[in-house]
Amino acid sequence: MEKFYNIDEQKFWNNNDIWLDSGHEWSSSFGTTENLWNKEIFDSIKEFRGKKILEIAPGFGRITQFLSILASELIVIDLNPLCIEKTKEKLGHHVLAYLTNDGKTLTGVRDNSQDLVFSFDSFVHMHANVTEEYVKEIFRVLKPGGQAFIHHSWLYGGSENSFDNSAGRANMSPEQFKGFVENNNMRIVSQTPIQFKPLNSWNGMDTISIFQK
């Protein structure tokens, strides 16, 4: 059987003890989560104000809080029930639907229903086969002309177990990710490496891919 995720990784993220500051600790390279949103994310998706947005793997809702203001309707979906529970506690009725999934599909989200699919700080840890399955599902749920904003790993040549690599990054290259997108009849709009500030050993490990159906 093909392995889609490591059960130990699932248990890791479903443990309340690792979320020391509800995930905001992972915004430290940008100063604050608000800085991360304003400097790395907002300009790329501001055109989707008042549109339908799906967020994959929201964690404890640190970016979700901003997406909920931007979107007319926001759906969040996560493998881990704890993440859905905490995001719901944080945002309540400001999110249209809170869904759990199997870690590779978007069951519960209708075909051709979303203007934007978004994910930050989650695909960086996903095995390539998980990413590939999600890209197939993103094609299914996006409206024609809709876009996806996916923050993913740019680390290639490490261990197949992402937890053995620096910062838990998965094996993935921009070319491999582009192949997944094009194989599903979508096109890459841009691929932008993230420059962490201050400069540190994480530079060159992540990229943001924006693609369109």
Predicted region positions:
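Class I SAM-dependent methyltransferase core
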Residues: E55
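A short acidic, Gly/Pro-enriched loop at the edge of an enzyme's catalytic core
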Residues: T107-V117
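Conserved acidic functional residues
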Residues: T64, D111, D121
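Class I (Rossmann-like) S-adenosyl-L-methionine-dependent methyltransferase catalytic domain
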Residues: M1-G50, G59-T107, M126-E133, Q147-Q212
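Structural signature of beta-strand start/N-cap positions in the alpha/beta core
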Residues: K52, E73, S113-D115
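A short SAM/SAH-binding and catalytic strip from SAM-dependent methyltransferases
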Residues: L116-N129
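A short glycine-rich, Lys/Arg-flanked "PGG" loop and its adjoining helix->strand segment in the class I
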Residues: E132-P144
